[in-house]
């Protein structure tokens, strides 16, 4: 077993590739979740689109990382932005919209060009619409299928950098060096690690933001 650990998986289908790596529990009903939880000491999940109720149920029996609250925050773009603002971490101007009229008002406030995104489930450029002119408002809202969305303004930037951090059970934090990401058509195509030409002050600034964020969630 990798690192001496026995792996267990909770999946929706018997065809899930996790079945090649360890015992797999199929379905997400209460009985299966209980069996999975009873058989697991520590649990983590693959993506922010995981059902919060499943994480809540598993947490009753097992240690789950990241926490249920972390999942609740990160699977909704509006809640993410609100938290960043509360922690004084800079982010693009934004506004939640639930109708064409709200989108029109948001554009008046934020300006164009801007990006309209679904508040949930979007990834790799999916669930997004680049609005360049007011003539595209109806088309953009139709692209969202009437779902709650978030309008984000553009910001000028030189490059995109990411930081990964880990926290121990004792609360200690460790940070990886910053990495540089390159996207094409909304999809991450290349990550260079470590990023080049990074000053110590920039690394420390990113670590400061991460410290505030990770201790909050």
Which residue stretches match the model-derived regions?
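A conserved helix-loop-beta module that forms one wall/lid of the active-site cleft
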Residues: 67-127, 134
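Structural detector of well-ordered beta-strand residues that form the stable sheet scaffold
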Residues: 8, 44, 64-66, 92, ...
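Short glycine-rich anion-binding loops that position phosphate/pyrophosphate groups of nucleotides
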Residues: 48-50, 119-121, 166
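A structural micro-motif
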Residues: 5, 21, 62-63, 89-92, ...
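Structural signal for conserved beta-strand scaffold positions within catalytic alpha/beta enzyme cores
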Residues: 9, 25, 66, 93-96, ...
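Internal nucleotide-binding/catalytic subdomain
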Residues: 131-217
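ATP-binding N-terminal substructure of ATP-dependent carboxylate-amine bond-forming enzymes
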Residues: 1-82, 101
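Structural alpha-helical scaffold elements that stabilize or flank donor/cofactor-binding regions
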Residues: 35-36, 106, 143
